[in-house]
């Protein structure tokens, strides 16, 4: 085809990336793409915003199953919904793409950057950017904010909506029966 081949340029040429993952459907196409480019994602599940706990467990278990099926490492950050509530206090009524989203992204990506720093991983990125409901600008701002505290960690600003990945994500979602499709397109 004439379509320009989708190129992945990892900061510093890292071959291992800490991937903050919001859920299996969003991460599947990204993980597949990384692996095709010989980049190994270490999956970091840090989503204290998900409520109730049952929903959190369902999503976490799906991510874990998916990671294990590919032989990938998955790290479960502790579920701390109370801490999350404290962080977004007073912003509960904010709309999608509002101030609460930015604060939530910052909290989750700061945790991701901290884990990367403590475990010798030099690059982080997130599957949050795959959803067209989220603001790419907010996600990138949160990623830069998160890595500012850790000079040894770089935030990889990759637009995961390009290169046919959105279509691939939808195809994977259709092929794999995920339980919480209601949260997606």
Describe each PLM feature range.
Residues 179-185:
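Conserved small/polar residues in nucleotide/adenosyl-binding loops
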Residues 1-163:
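ATP-dependent adenylation/nucleotidyltransferase module used to activate substrates
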């Amino acid at each position: 085809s004439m379509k320009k081949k989708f190129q992945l340029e990892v900061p510093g040429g890292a071959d291992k990336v800490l991937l903050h993952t919001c859920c299996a459907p969003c991460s599947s196409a990204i993980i597949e793409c990384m692996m095709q480019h010989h980049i190994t994602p270490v999956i970091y599940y840090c989503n204290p915003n998900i409520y109730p706990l049952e929903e959190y467990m369902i999503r976490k278990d799906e991510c874990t199953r998916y990671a294990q099926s590919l032989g990938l490492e998955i790290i479960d950050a502790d579920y701390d919904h109370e801490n999350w509530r404290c962080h977004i206090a007073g912003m509960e009524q904010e709309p999608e793409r509002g101030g609460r989203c930015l604060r939530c992204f910052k909290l989750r990506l700061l945790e991701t950057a901290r884990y990367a720093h403590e475990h010798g991983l030099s690059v982080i990125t997130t599957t949050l950017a795959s959803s067209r409901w989220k603001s790419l600008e907010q996600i990138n701002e949160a990623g830069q904010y998160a890595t500012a505290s850790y000079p040894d960690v770089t935030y990889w600003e990759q637009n995961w909506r390009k290169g046919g990945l959105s279509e691939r994500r939808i195809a994977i979602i259709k092929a794999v029966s995920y339980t919480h499709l209601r949260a997606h397109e």
